[in-house]
Amino acid sequence: LMYMEGCTAPQFETSTLHSAVVELVALKGAKIQYVTVQNWSSNVFNMVTKRGLAMEDAEIRWIDCNIGSGLTMKYPAVVLKGRRARGEVISIALANTGQHQDTGAKMIHAADDTTSNIVSKSISIGEGRASYRGQVIMGKGLKGCKNNTECDALLLAANSRTDTYPAITVKGDGGTVQHEASVSQVSEEMLFYMQQRGIPKAAAMSLAVNGFINDLVQEFPMEYSVELRRLIDLEMEDSIG
Protein backbone atom coordinates (compact mmCIF):
# COMPACT_ATOMS: atom_id res chain seq x y z
CA LEU A 1 0.00 0.00 0.00
CA MET A 2 1.29 3.47 -0.92
CA TYR A 3 -0.27 6.70 0.32
CA MET A 4 0.86 10.07 -1.04
CA GLU A 5 0.08 13.54 0.29
CA GLY A 6 1.04 17.08 -0.64
CA CYS A 7 0.66 19.99 1.79
CA THR A 8 0.54 23.66 0.80
CA ALA A 9 -1.21 26.88 1.86
CA PRO A 10 -1.46 30.55 0.83
CA GLN A 11 0.15 33.28 2.93
CA PHE A 12 -2.31 34.64 5.51
CA GLU A 13 -1.95 37.66 7.81
CA THR A 14 -2.10 35.56 10.97
CA SER A 15 -0.11 32.49 11.98
CA THR A 16 -1.62 29.04 11.53
CA LEU A 17 -1.05 25.75 13.34
CA HIS A 18 -1.05 22.44 11.49
CA SER A 19 -1.10 19.55 13.96
CA ALA A 20 -1.84 16.31 12.13
CA VAL A 21 -1.67 12.76 13.49
CA VAL A 22 -0.95 9.77 11.25
CA GLU A 23 -1.02 6.19 12.56
CA LEU A 24 -0.12 3.13 10.50
CA VAL A 25 -0.55 -0.53 11.44
CA ALA A 26 1.14 -3.09 9.19
CA LEU A 27 -0.08 -6.59 10.00
CA LYS A 28 1.86 -9.78 9.28
CA GLY A 29 3.59 -9.58 5.90
CA ALA A 30 2.11 -6.19 4.97
CA LYS A 31 4.03 -3.29 3.42
CA ILE A 32 3.05 0.36 3.82
CA GLN A 33 4.74 3.37 2.23
CA TYR A 34 3.68 6.90 3.23
CA VAL A 35 5.00 9.76 1.06
CA THR A 36 4.76 13.46 1.99
CA VAL A 37 5.89 16.68 0.30
CA GLN A 38 5.26 19.65 2.62
CA ASN A 39 5.34 23.21 1.29
CA TRP A 40 3.31 25.24 3.79
CA SER A 41 3.64 29.04 3.79
CA SER A 42 6.13 30.62 6.17
CA ASN A 43 3.53 31.61 8.80
CA VAL A 44 2.46 28.00 9.43
CA PHE A 45 3.64 26.10 12.52
CA ASN A 46 3.85 22.51 11.29
CA MET A 47 3.83 20.08 14.23
CA VAL A 48 2.98 16.58 13.11
CA THR A 49 2.84 13.18 14.82
CA LYS A 50 3.55 10.16 12.62
CA ARG A 51 3.87 6.66 14.07
CA GLY A 52 3.61 3.12 12.80
CA LEU A 53 3.39 -0.40 14.21
CA ALA A 54 5.01 -3.19 12.20
CA MET A 55 4.12 -6.79 13.01
CA GLU A 56 5.89 -10.00 11.93
CA ASP A 57 7.53 -9.73 8.48
CA ALA A 58 5.87 -6.34 7.93
CA GLU A 59 7.48 -3.18 6.58
CA ILE A 60 6.72 0.52 7.09
CA ARG A 61 8.47 3.28 5.11
CA TRP A 62 8.09 7.00 5.76
CA ILE A 63 9.33 9.12 2.82
CA ASP A 64 9.20 12.74 3.89
CA CYS A 65 10.18 16.11 2.43
CA ASN A 66 9.82 19.45 4.24
CA ILE A 67 10.40 22.68 2.33
CA GLY A 68 7.83 25.14 3.70
CA SER A 69 6.50 26.42 7.06
CA GLY A 70 8.24 28.72 9.53
CA LEU A 71 8.74 25.91 12.04
CA THR A 72 8.43 22.18 11.42
CA MET A 73 8.68 19.57 14.18
CA LYS A 74 8.19 16.09 12.75
CA TYR A 75 9.76 12.76 13.75
CA PRO A 76 8.14 9.73 12.05
CA ALA A 77 8.35 6.61 14.24
CA VAL A 78 8.14 2.86 13.71
CA VAL A 79 7.66 0.31 16.48
CA LEU A 80 9.09 -2.99 15.24
CA LYS A 81 6.91 -5.32 17.25
CA GLY A 82 7.02 -8.50 15.18
CA ARG A 83 9.95 -10.71 14.29
CA ARG A 84 11.73 -9.71 11.06
CA ALA A 85 9.80 -6.43 10.90
CA ARG A 86 11.43 -3.60 8.95
CA GLY A 87 11.21 0.17 9.29
CA GLU A 88 12.67 2.99 7.23
CA VAL A 89 12.58 6.80 7.25
CA ILE A 90 13.80 8.80 4.25
CA SER A 91 13.86 12.52 5.07
CA ILE A 92 14.71 15.70 3.13
CA ALA A 93 14.53 19.14 4.77
CA LEU A 94 15.25 22.55 3.28
CA ALA A 95 15.44 25.62 5.53
CA ASN A 96 15.65 29.15 4.15
CA THR A 97 16.01 32.41 6.09
CA GLY A 98 13.34 32.58 8.78
CA GLN A 99 12.74 28.82 8.76
CA HIS A 100 13.61 26.09 11.25
CA GLN A 101 13.16 22.54 9.98
CA ASP A 102 13.36 20.31 13.07
CA THR A 103 12.94 16.80 11.71
CA GLY A 104 14.14 13.28 12.44
CA ALA A 105 12.98 9.74 13.17
CA LYS A 106 12.39 7.20 15.91
CA MET A 107 12.91 3.43 15.66
CA ILE A 108 11.92 1.11 18.50
CA HIS A 109 13.10 -2.51 18.18
CA ALA A 110 10.81 -4.74 20.22
CA ALA A 111 11.37 -8.14 18.58
CA ASP A 112 14.22 -10.33 17.30
CA ASP A 113 15.71 -9.96 13.82
CA THR A 114 14.21 -6.52 13.23
CA THR A 115 15.85 -4.00 10.89
CA SER A 116 15.64 -0.22 10.68
CA ASN A 117 17.17 2.38 8.39
CA ILE A 118 17.19 6.17 8.74
CA VAL A 119 18.55 8.44 6.01
CA SER A 120 18.24 12.20 6.52
CA LYS A 121 19.57 15.04 4.38
CA SER A 122 19.11 18.74 5.10
CA ILE A 123 19.96 21.95 3.26
CA SER A 124 20.29 25.31 5.02
CA ILE A 125 20.09 28.50 2.94
CA GLY A 126 20.78 32.05 4.10
CA GLU A 127 20.05 32.14 7.83
CA GLY A 128 17.95 28.99 7.74
CA ARG A 129 18.31 26.32 10.43
CA ALA A 130 17.89 22.57 10.01
CA SER A 131 17.96 20.13 12.94
CA TYR A 132 17.98 16.35 13.03
CA ARG A 133 16.65 14.50 16.08
CA GLY A 134 16.86 10.74 16.02
CA GLN A 135 16.13 8.04 18.55
CA VAL A 136 16.92 4.34 18.23
CA ILE A 137 15.97 1.92 21.00
CA MET A 138 16.79 -1.80 21.14
CA GLY A 139 15.14 -3.69 23.97
CA LYS A 140 16.83 -6.00 26.44
CA GLY A 141 17.45 -9.61 25.42
CA LEU A 142 16.82 -9.11 21.71
CA LYS A 143 18.90 -10.86 19.04
CA GLY A 144 19.69 -10.12 15.42
CA CYS A 145 18.55 -6.48 15.44
CA LYS A 146 20.17 -4.01 13.05
CA ASN A 147 20.00 -0.25 12.63
CA ASN A 148 21.69 2.10 10.20
CA THR A 149 21.44 5.89 10.56
CA GLU A 150 22.85 8.48 8.16
CA CYS A 151 22.33 12.23 8.56
CA ASP A 152 24.06 14.63 6.18
CA ALA A 153 23.78 18.42 6.07
CA LEU A 154 24.65 20.97 3.40
CA LEU A 155 25.27 24.63 4.33
CA LEU A 156 24.94 27.26 1.60
CA ALA A 157 25.86 30.43 3.51
CA ALA A 158 28.09 31.61 6.34
CA ASN A 159 25.07 32.18 8.61
CA SER A 160 23.35 28.87 7.81
CA ARG A 161 22.96 26.50 10.75
CA THR A 162 22.58 22.78 11.26
CA ASP A 163 22.28 20.67 14.43
CA THR A 164 22.26 16.93 15.02
CA TYR A 165 20.84 15.29 18.16
CA PRO A 166 21.11 11.48 17.91
CA ALA A 167 20.05 9.26 20.82
CA ILE A 168 20.85 5.54 20.70
CA THR A 169 19.89 3.12 23.47
CA VAL A 170 20.92 -0.54 23.28
CA LYS A 171 19.92 -2.59 26.33
CA GLY A 172 21.56 -5.85 25.29
CA ASP A 173 24.42 -7.23 23.20
CA GLY A 174 22.44 -8.86 20.41
CA GLY A 175 22.14 -5.86 18.11
CA THR A 176 24.18 -3.88 15.60
CA VAL A 177 23.93 -0.11 15.39
CA GLN A 178 25.84 2.25 13.13
CA HIS A 179 25.56 6.02 12.88
CA GLU A 180 27.13 8.38 10.35
CA ALA A 181 26.85 12.16 10.12
CA SER A 182 28.48 14.78 7.91
CA VAL A 183 28.37 18.53 7.26
CA SER A 184 29.55 20.07 4.00
CA GLN A 185 29.47 23.34 2.09
CA VAL A 186 29.18 24.32 -1.55
CA SER A 187 32.66 25.53 -2.43
CA GLU A 188 33.27 28.88 -4.07
CA GLU A 189 35.59 27.15 -6.53
CA MET A 190 32.79 24.92 -7.80
CA LEU A 191 30.41 27.87 -8.19
CA PHE A 192 33.11 29.88 -9.97
CA TYR A 193 33.80 26.97 -12.33
CA MET A 194 30.13 26.66 -13.32
CA GLN A 195 29.62 30.41 -13.66
CA GLN A 196 32.62 30.60 -16.00
CA ARG A 197 30.71 28.22 -18.26
CA GLY A 198 27.65 30.44 -18.42
CA ILE A 199 25.61 28.90 -15.61
CA PRO A 200 23.95 31.59 -13.42
CA LYS A 201 24.73 31.42 -9.70
CA ALA A 202 21.17 30.41 -8.72
CA ALA A 203 21.19 27.59 -11.29
CA ALA A 204 24.63 26.47 -10.10
CA MET A 205 23.42 26.33 -6.50
CA SER A 206 20.36 24.35 -7.60
CA LEU A 207 22.59 21.85 -9.39
CA ALA A 208 24.68 21.42 -6.24
CA VAL A 209 21.62 20.94 -4.04
CA ASN A 210 19.92 18.53 -6.43
CA GLY A 211 23.12 16.51 -6.65
CA PHE A 212 23.31 16.37 -2.85
CA ILE A 213 19.80 14.91 -2.47
CA ASN A 214 19.52 13.07 -5.78
CA ASP A 215 19.68 9.56 -4.28
CA LEU A 216 16.80 10.37 -1.90
CA VAL A 217 14.67 12.17 -4.49
CA GLN A 218 14.69 8.96 -6.52
CA GLU A 219 12.80 7.29 -3.66
CA PHE A 220 9.80 9.53 -4.37
CA PRO A 221 7.20 8.67 -7.04
CA MET A 222 7.95 10.31 -10.39
CA GLU A 223 5.34 13.08 -10.18
CA TYR A 224 6.50 14.03 -6.69
CA SER A 225 10.20 13.99 -7.53
CA VAL A 226 9.61 16.38 -10.45
CA GLU A 227 7.62 18.73 -8.22
CA LEU A 228 10.24 18.51 -5.49
CA ARG A 229 13.08 19.52 -7.81
CA ARG A 230 11.04 22.45 -9.10
CA LEU A 231 10.27 23.66 -5.57
CA ILE A 232 13.97 23.55 -4.73
CA ASP A 233 14.81 25.53 -7.87
CA LEU A 234 12.28 28.20 -6.84
CA GLU A 235 13.77 28.39 -3.34
CA MET A 236 17.23 28.87 -4.79
CA GLU A 237 16.05 31.59 -7.18
CA ASP A 238 14.37 33.48 -4.34
CA SER A 239 17.38 33.19 -2.02
CA ILE A 240 19.94 34.30 -4.61
CA GLY A 241 17.67 36.96 -6.10
Model regions: which residues?
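Small/polar glycine-rich anion-binding or flexible loop at a beta-alpha turn
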Residues: 187, 206-215
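Conserved beta-strand/loop scaffold segments within soluble protein domains that form the structured core
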Residues: 1-199, 217-241
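Conserved tryptophan-centered aromatic signature that marks the ligand-binding surface of SH3
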Residues: 203
